[in-house]
Amino acid sequence: MTSFEAQQETFDCSEYGNGSCPENERSLGVRAAMYSLMAGAIFITIFGNLVMIISISYFKQLHTPTNLLILSMAVTDFLLGFTIMPYSMVRSVENCWYFGLTFCKIHYSFDLMLSITSIFHLCSVAIDRFYAICHPLHYCTKMTIPVVKRLLLVCWSVPGAFAFGVVFSEAYADGIEGYDILVACSSSCPVMFNKLWGTTLFVAGFFTPSSMMVGIYGKIFAVSKKHARVIDNLPENQNNQMRKDKKAAKTLGIVMGVFLLCWFPCFFTILLDPFLNFSTPAILFDALTWFGYFNSTCNPLIYGFFYPWFRRALRYILLGKIFSSHFHNTNLFTQKETE
């Protein structure tokens, strides 16, 4: 994501410059360090989420409604790492967009779509955990595979329609003085939000779903506390299931918290920037964008830390065991984890 000031600093658009990139003031060592850090994040994002995708798709034991949502969220993070972060890395390090205006809009549309898609997925996961913990008797009838597929359709279609519609219609730039001049600069990537669409993006794309998530998880943990007081008096099989559901909710709650921590500064800056006459420093805007990207890097690390089955699946994938016939029926859970 770019800001208006970032474009002004990169190009002398007010005087219709020749569209060439300015000389990069960063030393070779600084650029090498930036490339190394960002490339490392990209590798972890792509590889980690690819492992999650393969694991849930391959092992039959993981074919549950909850994991179907997690699988789709991993696809979102994988696409961000594969299609968005590499081009953003070049732009951030070189201080220039080399890929043209049309691809700039496509890139930004996917960037915006995937970030909103992530939060929609987290809302869906929160709903899934709500029924599993707060209404366990109705979970199997409420969160069926067809219901999850409809949720996923909403998670992908609504952010996609919003992102591509707003960016390609250029409604986001209505009333921004100098925008047409920025477009005339061939090497710029002039995407910024006016007051109306900056507010709309923040409220509809971040604040509202985030508030819903926080409210749902608040209810989940309140119910979990009540369950903890009576859990010892329940039958063993019901006791074990409630413990597993609570642990899953805790892990996914951490995923939600990391997402909000990583993306709130960027979305909040998009909200404030037009009210501050687009005065956000370019380096700050870029740093906040990458802080948001790093959320997709963190997710597979969180899964690896909290889910032993993820680590086992990774080992099986690296050893090539998934190419053996019938290996997809392998049990990924130990006796202790199923109790």
Curated annotation (Swiss-Prot):
- Tell me which CDD domains the record gives: 7tmA_TAAR2_3_4
Tell me which parts of the chain lie in the Extracellular compartment.
Answer: 1-36, 89-106, 172-195, 273-287
- Which stretches are transmembrane? 37-57, 68-88, 107-127, 151-171, 196-216, 252-272, 288-310
Q: Name one GO cellular component term.
A: plasma membrane
Which intervals lie on the Cytoplasmic side per UniProt?
Answer: 58-67, 128-150, 217-251, 311-339
Q: Name one GO biological process term.
A: G protein-coupled receptor signaling pathway
Which Gene3D superfamilies is this protein grouped with?
Answer: Rhodopsin 7-helix transmembrane proteins (1.20.1070.10)
- How the protein sits in the membrane? Multi-pass membrane protein
User: Which InterPro entries does UniProt cross-reference here?
Assistant: GPCR_Rhodpsn (IPR000276), GPCR_Rhodpsn_7TM (IPR017452), TAAR (IPR050569), TAAR_fam (IPR009132)
Can you list the disulfide-bonded cysteine pairs?
A: C21-C185, C104-C189
Q: Tell me, what is one Gene Ontology molecular-function annotation carried by this entry?
A: trace-amine receptor activity
List where in the cell it is found. Answer: Cell membrane
Recite the UniProt keywords alphabetically. Answer: Cell membrane, Disulfide bond, G-protein coupled receptor, Glycoprotein, Membrane, Receptor, Transducer, Transmembrane, Transmembrane helix
PROSITE patterns, per database record: G_PROTEIN_RECEP_F1_1, G_PROTEIN_RECEP_F1_2
Q: Which residues are glycosylated?
A: N18, N277
Tell me the protein family, please: Belongs to the G-protein coupled receptor 1 family.
Domain comment (free text): In addition to the well known disulfide bond common to G-protein coupled receptor 1 family, trace amine-associated receptors (TAARs) contain an unique disulfide bond (Cys-21-Cys-185) connecting the N-terminus to the extracellular Loop 2 (ECL2), which is required for agonist-induced receptor activation.
Its biological purpose is as follows:
Orphan olfactory receptor specific for trace amines. Trace amine compounds are enriched in animal body fluids and act on trace amine-associated receptors (TAARs) to elicit both intraspecific and interspecific innate behaviors. Ligand-binding causes a conformation change that triggers signaling via the G(s)-class of G-proteins which activate adenylate cyclase. May also be required to provide olfactory input into limbic brain areas to regulate emotional behaviors likely via modulation of the dopamine system.
Q: What is this protein called?
A: Trace amine-associated receptor 2
- What does the record give as the organism's lineage? Eukaryota, Metazoa, Chordata, Craniata, Vertebrata
